[in-house]
């Protein structure tokens, strides 16, 4: 399944320099989906040089042309939603209907940023000197390292890649080793949509090794990460040494609050969706429920009744509401 991909560098799919691979597991069957390419230090350096060169091309591309390409990515995602969704279900384990919804959300993000490309406004400020005008012009920050998690690889890769492209930046995307194929398919769509060589790159392999080498480089000017607080702290410390800008979305500890004036049927439906989407492997999945005493019993009964009706199974099977946990580690926890 992964033989058509590999590392995406300078507009081309290529196998890793050392020809190393790692196994990707289907969580529903525990079977090996295939072996994905594992990047070495040589591959990371190639990607950095590629992105540095791609930046010069993309930042000098007009906002209108960038917008056209980004919108084309959204269009192709919708055309190929079944392919992308299948990758998500096979690698993450989520039900196919959830996977299709995630692809739609990712396409919407690209469409939104296609319009934002043309809305990067500067400013004119009043000067203290009578014959002076002060103008503010916004320029691309540079090459972006996008570190993508496994639980929502399409929507979160879309968020990171599309915003970088809208701002005129090139990007090196690192998918999680659990879900490389879904992001590879998305990057291939970027290629087919006309993104110039070197503007979008992908490195697949050991997360710590790739991330550390990217952040050690003077070429990387910004890091975007969605992940755990523990990893976020490590990234923040490394980024500080290079004064790299950082955008972080870390962990979650979400309460679900129910007041006494609610429509209980709607609230119970929302609670089930929030708690069990992607089998609860979501940073905003509720782990605490605060219910006003007057409605507590009613809520508990409604929630339990709906939970009993959820169908557990392989995400590829029609009618499945709850797929497997994605990794053995999560099952053991």
Indicate residue ranges for each PLM-predicted region.
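Rossmann-like NAD(P) dinucleotide-binding subdomain of oxidoreductase/dehydrogenase enzymes
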Residues: 122-266
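ALDH superfamily catalytic-core signature
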Residues: 230-333
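Generic secondary-structure signature for well-ordered alpha-helical cores
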Residues: 53-57, 75-82, 93, 115-119, ...
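Terminal low-complexity tails and localization/encapsulation signals of metabolic enzymes
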Residues: 1-35, 68, 72, 122-145
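Short linear capping/connector segments at secondary-structure termini
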Residues: 87-95, 125-131, 251, 317-323
């Amino acid at each position: 399944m992964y033989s058509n991909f590999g590392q995406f560098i300078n507009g081309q799919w290529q196998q890793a320099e050392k020809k190393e691979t790692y196994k990707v597991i289907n969580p529903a069957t525990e079977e090996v989906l295939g072996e994905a390419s594992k990047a070495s230090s040589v591959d990371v350096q190639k990607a950095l040089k590629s992105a540095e060169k791609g930046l010069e091309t993309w930042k000098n591309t007009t906002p209108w042309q960038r917008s056209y390409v980004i919108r084309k990515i959204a269009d192709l995602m919708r055309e190929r939603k079944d392919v992308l969704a299948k990758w998500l279900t096979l690698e993450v384990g989520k039900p196919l209907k959830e996977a299709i919804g995630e692809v739609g959300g990712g396409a919407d993000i690209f469409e939104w940023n296609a319009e934002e490309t043309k809305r990067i406004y500067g400013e004119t400020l009043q000067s203290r000197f009578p014959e002076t005008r002060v103008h503010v012009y916004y320029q691309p920050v540079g090459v972006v390292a996008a570190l993508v998690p496994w639980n929502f690889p399409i929507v979160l890769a879309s968020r990171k890649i599309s915003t970088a492209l809208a701002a005129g930046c090139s990007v090196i995307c690192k998918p999680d080793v659990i879900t490389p194929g879904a992001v590879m398919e998305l990057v291939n769509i970027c290629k087919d949509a006309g993104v110039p060589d070197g503007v979008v790159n992908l490195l697949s392999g050991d997360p710590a090794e790739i991330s550390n080498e990217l952040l050690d480089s003077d070429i990387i000017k910004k890091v975007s990460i969605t992940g755990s607080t523990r990893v976020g702290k490590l990234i923040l410390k490394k980024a500080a040494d290079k004064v790299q800008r950082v955008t972080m979305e870390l962990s979650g500890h979400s309460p679900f609050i129910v007041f006494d004036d609610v429509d209980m049927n709607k609230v119970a439906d929302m609670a089930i969706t929030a708690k069990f989407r992607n089998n609860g492997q979501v940073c905003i999945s509720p782990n605490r429920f605060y219910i006003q005493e007057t409605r507590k019993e009613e809520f508990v009964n409604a929630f339990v009744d709906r939970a009993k009706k959820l169908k557990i199974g392989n995400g590829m099977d029609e009618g499945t509401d709850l797929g497997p946990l994605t990794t053995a580690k999560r099952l053991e926890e």
